[in-house]
UniProtKB/Swiss-Prot annotation:
Protein name, as recorded: Small ribosomal subunit protein uS8
Gene3D superfamilies (UniProt xref): 3.30.1370.30, 3.30.1490.10
Pfam families: Ribosomal_S8
Lineage: Bacteria, Pseudomonadati, Pseudomonadota, Alphaproteobacteria, Hyphomicrobiales
Organism: Brucella anthropi (strain ATCC 49188 / DSM 6882 / CCUG 24695 / JCM 21032 / LMG 3331 / NBRC 15819 / NCTC 12168 / Alc 37) (Ochrobactrum anthropi)
Gene that specifies this protein: rpsH
Its biological purpose: One of the primary rRNA binding proteins, it binds directly to 16S rRNA central domain where it helps coordinate assembly of the platform of the 30S subunit.
GO MF, any single term: structural constituent of ribosome
Recorded GO CC terms: ribonucleoprotein complex; ribosome
Homology family: Belongs to the universal ribosomal protein uS8 family.
Transmembrane portions of the chain: none
GO biological process terms on file: translation
Keyword field contains Membrane: no
Quaternary state and interactors: Part of the 30S ribosomal subunit. Contacts proteins S5 and S12.
Source taxon at top rank: Bacteria
Keywords of the record: Ribonucleoprotein, Ribosomal protein, RNA-binding, rRNA-binding
Amino acid sequence: MSVSDPIGDMLTRIRNAVGRKKTKVSTPASKLRARVLDVLQSEGYIRGYTQSEFVNGKAEIEIELKYYEGVPVIRELTRVSKPGRRVYVSVKSIPQVANGLGISILSTPKGVMADHEAREQNVGGELLCRIF
């Protein structure tokens, strides 16, 4: 069965795993998912991830979630731009998440990046999700 929103599917898997206090969660692999996970890792929301190839030829990504003293680092994870309603923002209209305590992840012409990186590089794009 095909997934109409692969990023939304991955974020839901992470949200469900955090709710169940799991240490790891797996999701089908793609380049866009890996770029989003790169941003989450560099911003300190996950410990890391590994890509693995299975016998049937389908690659999977195993995400290692991060906890601080038993409390999940990810408190809120929401998808903004969806297949039915894409949300694009200019550099001037990139929203702050929780007064700067959280981040937004954008897909820009210069790659997938966090909101503060997009402001530094003066580039807008599709607002993928918000993390707090």
